[in-house]
């Protein structure tokens, strides 16, 4: 199966893309390093009005969960991880990422009209590769993200039942 065949359905893509956009804004805000409570964040926004985020972002719990999933899956490919961060956290366009990728690309063995040889990839090739890498990254991330969100909901339900049970035992 080729990389171009790894596609999500429209609904899957919209679900994952929505969460990754919220996560990207959360990472960009710096909350990954200093896990702020929402009270502190609101206070900081009132003190520093220029630092107000205009992008919607997820809460700290969702951000940490998504970061754990992304880190666990994307550690395999540092380049794909960098492209994912550039696109979702920094808000870079695919064209801008491809342009940087093109500028820093080293010559590699490629087939072309002149035959096989060592060439620097064209900007169009870089754009296609960035598209393919992002699509493959989303495909690889989808199922672990689904599992993480489902497991978290189950854990919350179990915690609620366990706390209730513990309260009943302590009251006896």
Summary of predicted features, one role per range:
Residues 95-99:
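Residues within the helices of the helix-turn-helix
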Residues 1-75, 102-118, 122, 132-172:
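N-terminal interaction/assembly modules
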Residues 125:
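Residues in the helix-turn-helix
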Residues 87-91:
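Short helix-to-turn junction characteristic of helix-turn-helix DNA-binding domains
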Residues 83-84:
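A short pre-motif secondary-structure segment
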